[in-house]
C-alpha cells in the first residue's frame, strides 16, 4: 500500500477556496478522520456542509465510484439521510486543489447529514436494530450494482486481504491475551473460508457501517431516522462483508450480542437476501472485523497517539471479541440461518430422511412402548393445578406430588409436553440478558418423562456418553447425562 499523505491545508487556506469555487462564505471546523481531512462548513444562514479533502493517494476513478454510490444510495433512503454532493461553479462534483506544500488533492463538498452517532444514541431496541439492518441491506443493494471494476485502490480494512493484514500488524499487539484471541479468530476464519471463497458474491460495498458513520435522528413514539456517511472506505469485496461489518459494531456493548446480530441480519435479508454460503462465513467475518479494529487501532494509536478518533472503538471491541471466544461458531451460524428464514441446521433434510428410514427400529426409552394404558400426559403449563402444587416446594416434595398424581391416574409413566409455557423457571440462573433488558425463561424446550425411581433407561440407538454432570443450582436439572450418537 502506498504511503498516505494526509492533506496539510489550514482553515485560512480553505475559506477563500470555498468562496471562489462554491460561492459560499462559511466558517470551518475540522472533524475527526483517519486518512483524509474533513471540515464542518457553516453559512450564516444556518446551511451546513462537509468539506472533504482526500489524501494524495486517492485516485479520480475511486472518487467517482464514491460519487456513484452516494447517488444510488440516496435514491433508496429517505431524503437527507445520505450526503448529497454540492457541485462547484463549473458543475463538477470534484475539484483538484494544491496544498501549501505543493501536493495535489481532490476536494468535494457535500450537504451535512444531521443526527447523533449511533455510538451516542440509546436505546438500541429490537426495532432499531431491524431498521439498521434494513438500511444496510438497501445500501448493499444499491452499491453492488455499480458497474465500475475493482480498482487498484488498496485498503487495510479489506476482507479479501484480512489474513495478510493481520499477520503484518499483529506484532504491534503487546497484550498476550488479545493476541491469542486474534490468532484463534483468524484460524477459524481461514478454515471456514477456504472451501467457500470461490462461491461468495463480490461487488462494491460501503465497508464501514461503524457506530460513528451511522447517524440517528430520534423521533417521539416512532422509530428514529437513520442516515449513513463516509463512503471513503468503499471497496470491491465480498458482499456479505457489509453485513459482517455492520454486525460487528451493532454488537458492541450489548447484553446479548448475538441477538443484536440476528436482528440486524433479519432486516438486512429483507432487502438483500443472503445466500447459504454467506451465512456460513458471516460469524467468522464479524470476528475478523473486530480483529482488524483492534490490530490496526493498536498500530495507528502508537504511530499517531494524539488522534483520539483512532481509539474510539478499542475498549468495546476488545470486550466483544473476548465474549465471542465463548460462542460456538455453529450456534451463531444456525441463529443467522434462522433469521433469514432458512432451516437453522443445514443438515435437517438429511436427518429427516435418515429418521424416516430408521423409524420403527428405535429401542424404547423405558424398555416398553408408551401407550394410553401405562402413560398420562401432564399439564405443567402456567396456571395448571399440577403446576401450582409443584411450585415453590422441595425436590423431595415434588417427587411425592408426581408419584401421587401418577397413582391417581393409574399410570406408571408421566410425559411432560414440548414447547409448554411454564412458570417453574424462577431462579436467577434462568434470567437471560436481552436487547430489551432481563428476560426470564418461560418455554420448556424438551420432553419430560417421569417414572418410578430405579426404572431402567435405554438409548434409542447406539451412542456414547458425551457428558455427565450434576447441576446442583436451585431449580436446575440435577444429575444430567448427555449422549452422542453418530448416524
What are these regions (language model features)?
Residues 120-177, 200-202:
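A cross-family kinase active-site recognition segment
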Residues 459-487:
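Zn2+-dependent peptidoglycan hydrolase active-site motif and core
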Residues 53-104, 121, 126-130:
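A conserved alpha-helical element in kinase catalytic cores
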Residues 341-448, 452:
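Polar/charged, compositionally biased leader and regulatory segments
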Amino acid at each position: 500500500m502506498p504511503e498516505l499523505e494526509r492533506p496539510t491545508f489550514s482553515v485560512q487556506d480553505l475559506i477563500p477556496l470555498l468562496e471562489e469555487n462554491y460561492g459560499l462564505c462559511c466558517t470551518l471546523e475540522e472533524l475527526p478522520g483517519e486518512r483524509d481531512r474533513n471540515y464542518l462548513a457553516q453559512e450564516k444562514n444556518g446551511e451546513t456542509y462537509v468539506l472533504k479533502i482526500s489524501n494524495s493517494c486517492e485516485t479520480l476513478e475511486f472518487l467517482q465510484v464514491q460519487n456513484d454510490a452516494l447517488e444510488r444510495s440516496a435514491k433508496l433512503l429517505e431524503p437527507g439521510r445520505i450526503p448529497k454532493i454540492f457541485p462547484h461553479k463549473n458543475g463538477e462534483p470534484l475539484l483538484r486543489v494544491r496544498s501549501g506544500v505543493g501536493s495535489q488533492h481532490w476536494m468535494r463538498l457535500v450537504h451535512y447529514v444531521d443526527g447523533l452517532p449511533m455510538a451516542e444514541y440509546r436505546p438500541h431496541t429490537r426495532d432499531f436494530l431491524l431498521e439498521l439492518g434494513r438500511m444496510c441491506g438497501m445500501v448493499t443493494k444499491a452499491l453492488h450494482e455499480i458497474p465500475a471494476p475493482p480498482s487498484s485502490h488498496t485498503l487495510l480494512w479489506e476482507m479479501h486481504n484480512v489474513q495478510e493484514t493481520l499477520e503484518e500488524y499483529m506484532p504491534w499487539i503487546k497484550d498476550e491475551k488479545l493476541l491469542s484471541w486474534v490468532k484463534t479468530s483468524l484460524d477459524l476464519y481461514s478454515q471456514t473460508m477456504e472451501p467457500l471463497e470461490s462461491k461468495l458474491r463480490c461487488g462494491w460495498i460501503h465497508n464501514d457501517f461503524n457506530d460513528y458513520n451511522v447517524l440517528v435522528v430520534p423521533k417521539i413514539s416512532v422509530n428514529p431516522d437513520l442516515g449513513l456517511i463516509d463512503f471513503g472506505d468503499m471497496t470491491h469485496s465480498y458482499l456479505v462483508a457489509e453485513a459482517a461489518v455492520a454486525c460487528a459494531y451493532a454488537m458492541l456493548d450489548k447484553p446479548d450480542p448475538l441477538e443484536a446480530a440476528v436482528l440486524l441480519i433479519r432486516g438486512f435479508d429483507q432487502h438483500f437476501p443472503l445466500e447459504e454460503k454467506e451465512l456460513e462465513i458471516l460469524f467468522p467475518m464479524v470476528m475478523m472485523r473486530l480483529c482488524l479494529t483492534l490490530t490496526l487501532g493498536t498500530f495507528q494509536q502508537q504511530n499517531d497517539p494524539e488522534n483520539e478518533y483512532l481509539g474510539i472503538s478499542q475498549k468495546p471491541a476488545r470486550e466483544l471479541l473476548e465474549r465471542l471466544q465463548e460462542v460456538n461458531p455453529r450456534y451463531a451460524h444456525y441463529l443467522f440461518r434462522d433469521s433469514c428464514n432458512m432451516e437453522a441446521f443445514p443438515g435437517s433434510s438429511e436427518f429427516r430422511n435418515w429418521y424416516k428410514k430408521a423409524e420403527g427400529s428405535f429401542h424404547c426409552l423405558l424398555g416398553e412402548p408408551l401407550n394410553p394404558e401405562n402413560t398420562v400426559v401432564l399439564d405443567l403449563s402456567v396456571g395448571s393445578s399440577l403446576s401450582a402444587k409443584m411450585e415453590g416446594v422441595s425436590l423431595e416434595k415434588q417427587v411425592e406430588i408426581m408419584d401421587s398424581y401418577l397413582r391417581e391416574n393409574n399410570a406408571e409413566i408421566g410425559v411432560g409436553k414440548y414447547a409448554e409455557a411454564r412458570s417453574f423457571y424462577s431462579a436467577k440462573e434462568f434470567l437471560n440478558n436481552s436487547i430489551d433488558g432481563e428476560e426470564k425463561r418461560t418455554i420448556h424446550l424438551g420432553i419430560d418423562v417421569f417414572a418410578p425411581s430405579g426404572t431402567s433407561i435405554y438409548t434409542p440407538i447406539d451412542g456414547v456418553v458425551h457428558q455427565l454432570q450434576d447441576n446442583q443450582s436451585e431449580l436446575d436439572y440435577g444429575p444430567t447425562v448427555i449422549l452422542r450418537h453418530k448416524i
